[in-house]
Amino acid sequence: MSVLQVLHYPDERLRKIAAPVKEVNGEIQRIVDDMFETMYAEEGIGLAATQVDVHLQIIVIDVSENRDQRLVLINPELLEKSGETGIEEGCLSIPEQRALVPRAEKVKIRALDRDGKPFELEADDLLAICIQHEMDHLVGKLFVDYLSPLKRQRIRQKLEKMAKLNARAN
């Protein structure tokens, strides 16, 4: 397994729409494993393939405290959503920035697992929020897209400043 490079906003590759996975095979499973390795290394709770410049409908999630409840969603489909909630969300592609984003409180999805087997899942709370956040990535949407243009511009400026400082340090 290897740690992949996470794309950072405003990189336009984050806006690409992911294609469905045609066949779950060894290559797809390797991508899934590398995505988990990357997510854990970056201390995230979810990662969409788009964020590592792989434009396929693959999501990995682990919201557990012990980091031992891996969830793989290949070709996920939202079947139902209900209620309203929101927390301050962060994103590995938008480092050190957080914002309150409105989300459905509960979701029901259908997807394929790491072995290509179909399943349905009902989720609520943090898991439901994480699923919605990662599914947004698959259609080129970021949490900053829910914010006002002014807030979005501020975040962009902060990230550009951070990138310049990091470039000088290296």
Curated annotation (Swiss-Prot):
Any one Gene Ontology molecular-function term assigned to this protein's record: peptide deformylase activity
Q: What class of enzyme is it?
A: hydrolase
Q: Which UniProt keywords apply?
A: Hydrolase, Iron, Metal-binding, Protein biosynthesis
How, per the record, is the cofactor bound? Binds 1 Fe(2+) ion.
* Keyword Kinase among UniProt keywords: no
Needed cofactors: Fe(2+)
The alphabetized list of GO BP terms reads: co-translational protein modification; translation
| Keyword Hydrolase among UniProt keywords | yes
Q: Where does Fe cation bind?
A: C91, H133, H137
Q: Which InterPro entries match?
A: Peptide_deformylase, Peptide_deformylase_sf
Q: Which Gene3D superfamilies match?
A: Peptide deformylase
The cross-references to SUPFAM superfamilies, in alphabetical order and at most eight, read: Peptide deformylase (SSF56420)
Reactions catalysed, as given in the entry: N-terminal N-formyl-L-methionyl-[peptide] + H2O = N-terminal L-methionyl-[peptide] + formate
Report the EC code(s) recorded for this entry: 3.5.1.88
Residues at the active site: E134
Name the PANTHER family on file.
PEPTIDE DEFORMYLASE (PTHR10458:SF21)
Q: What does this protein do?
A: Removes the formyl group from the N-terminal Met of newly synthesized proteins. Requires at least a dipeptide for an efficient rate of reaction. N-terminal L-methionine is a prerequisite for activity but the enzyme has broad specificity at other positions.
Give the protein family. Answer: Belongs to the polypeptide deformylase family.
Q: What is this protein called?
A: Peptide deformylase
